[in-house]
């Protein structure tokens, strides 16, 4: 019984150590994680509303409307850094 518990603990420590090594890699920014490739989401200065015809309006150029669930009021957002 004690041998099984000891073996289980050894395996658990080995797995935890392996996961740590995998996640503790280089912190240098590269590839898709690079800030050169990142985009930024920001709120615009306006809100938006859904009309009775189901069309959303109120966002200025370059912004789009986001809302939660079945709400008829939302906030306008934009993405910066998108080609």
Swiss-Prot record:
Keyword entries, A-Z: Disulfide bond, Glycoprotein, Secreted, Signal
GO-annotated molecular function: C-X-C chemokine binding
Disulfide bonds, paired cysteine numbers: 44-63, 48-65, 59-76
Location of this chain's protein in the cell: Secreted
GO cellular component: extracellular region
First and last residue of the signal peptide: 1-24
Stretches of the chain forming a coiled coil according to its record: none
Residues that carry a glycan: 47, 70
Main location: secreted
Keyword Signal: yes
Keyword Nucleotidyltransferase in annotation: no
Function: Salivary chemokine-binding protein which binds to host chemokines CXCL1, CXCL2, CXCL3, CXCL5, CXCL6, CXCL10, CXCL11 and CXCL13.
The protein's name in its UniProt record: Evasin P1090
Organism: Ixodes ricinus (Common tick)
Taxonomic lineage: Eukaryota, Metazoa, Ecdysozoa, Arthropoda, Chelicerata
């Amino acid at each position: 019984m004690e041998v099984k518990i000891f073996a289980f603990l050894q395996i658990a420590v080995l797995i935890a150590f392996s996961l740590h090594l995998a996640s503790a890699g280089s912190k240098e920014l590269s590839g898709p994680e690079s800030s050169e490739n990142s985009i930024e989401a920001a709120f615009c200065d306006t809100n938006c509303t859904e009309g009775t015809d189901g069309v959303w309006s109120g966002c200025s150029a370059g912004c789009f409307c986001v809302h939660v669930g079945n709400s008829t009021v939302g906030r306008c957002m934009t993405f910066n850094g998108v080609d």
